[in-house]
Amino acid sequence: MDLKELYSLRNNFTIIGLTGRTGSGCSKIAEILSNDYHSFEKEGLRDVNEFNNIIFKRKYSICKKYLENGDNWVKFVVIKYVDVLLFFILNKYGGDYAKIKELLLDNYKESRSESNHRIVSSVMKEIKAIDYEYTETINEIKSFDHFKDIKDESELRRLDAVFFGENYYNLKKKLFEVLNNGGYFRTRLLLHWTSCNIRSTGDPLLTEKPNIKNIYTIANLINRLIKAKRIVNGSKPTKIVIDSIRNSLELMFFKERYSAFYMLATKDIIGNTRERIDGRLCETLTDSSERERIVLKVLDLDATEYRTKDFSKGIFSSPDLENCIQKSDYHIFNLKKDDLPEFIRKYCNNDANGFYTREEQLLKLLSLIQLPGIITPNSIERAMQIANTAKLNSGCVSRKVGAVITEKYVNICQ
């Protein structure tokens, strides 16, 4: 019997959900996963001969040889949360200028008190021009009734063709370009409040009469897109990466539905967050002081989404990044190959033996997903497994905490 058959389910279908603080690298991880193996290897994998620890060298070599062999590497299809959000808005209000203007007046502002009539009028002119250019695509999006009820194979194929098609790609690109030109932080807040409204009321505009039944509205649409992609791919492997999930109930939605779902949290390890956000603003803002002001506002919003107390008040529609990160299955730090020497010197006592770059960490994760047990866990991972078991068995209702005490060689103290 061919051993490939034993792992065929893992090889043929995988969903990775991404989460992390703003600027931590979720979009970059999604981009890396969507590339071919050659790009993946070139960008962040070190040569095996750069390691001097025989055991680690063997583990690294096994993972590398496995993924580069045959068709073990399959490019992931990226489902961007913001693209799904825009798709939902267009389905609801596409072509309805009065509703779109109302949505922008309510949410496209840097603060609730800001008067944004002038900038909304300017943005609406450009939106109308885009709407005229892509009327047919918008009408196709509006032709879908209730996304949750799309189960017919022909309708799922049509959903896949529209969402992943070139026309919608160009449409969303132009719309976000217009919105970002009007203000990057305004766009962030528009997406923030609109997603909260949809999870609360099922409508981008409504804020009153929240209903917990609407909490999975966006997740249900993503779920339909996943099913559509599986049908279109047929017998070919389907690999999906969701960029990114910021509500822990949506996270649990996918965990409970798919055994092949893995939640991955990213972390900025060397303090490049500000620099990354500033880099996104350079194209539209030349004034450095204005960029700094926007960066601070974006980081403040990120802190709000991370430390939110809304869940304790029974408001489940808000983003709660802290819970998302805590409930993640796998944690990686966003470390480029160029930053490796500084990281090794600062954190690893000049020991270069380890899966350190983001590509190397993904190399290990994907190998283990597709072939569990391909390499054995290291001492830190074994200790963390015990700590996690202690956490799961914690008697504390409010905080599930687990820990293990080791000596310097990570041997567990008795």
Cite the ranges covered by each PLM segment.
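Glycine-rich phosphate-binding loop of ATP-dependent small-molecule kinases
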Residues: 1-243, 247-275, 281-395, 403-413
